[in-house]
Regions:
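Short S/T/G/P-rich N-terminal loop/turn motif that feeds into the first structured element of a domain
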Residues: 1-52, 59-70, 80-118
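A short, acidic, amphipathic alpha-helical segment used as a generic capping/interface helix at domain edges
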Residues: 72-76
Length: 118
């Protein structure tokens, strides 16, 4: 399997914040699109506009770290419109980098098979 780093973020859009959520999402998507090692950054919303899932994939751990380096600025924006429920990591990370995600709402899934064609 490739050394891509993949995770999903799940959360609830704050009551009455959907329009603001869309503006924040657009800002964060624009930022992520400019990152060289960001391969995939897709946001999906439930039909009732209450839940958001974000699928993120990076070229490697360095690219993922570069993306998260902006959390100091982008994190407060995101958290102003979303209550984060869960982060699921689908990659084998270094112990040091895994600590970035450590917490009660984090789940680590160990890759055991499959393939990526891109």
């Amino acid at each position: 399997m490739k050394k891509h780093v993949t995770w999903t973020v799940q959360g609830q859009i704050k009551e009455g914040k959907y329009d603001e959520f869309l503006l924040v999402m657009a800002q964060l998507v624009t930022l992520a699109k400019s990152e060289a090692g960001t391969l995939m950054y897709e946001w999906t919303v439930s039909e009732d506009k209450r839940n958001v899932h974000i699928y993120e994939r990076y070229q490697d751990e360095d690219a993922a770290k570069a993306h998260l380096a902006g959390w100091g600025e982008s994190g407060p924006l995101f958290l102003s419109v979303v209550d984060m429920d869960k982060v699921t990591v689908f990659s084998q990370l270094s112990e040091e980098f895994a600590q970035t995600f450590a917490g009660p709402s984090s789940v680590f899934m160990k890759p055991v098979g499959g393939f990526v064609k891109f």
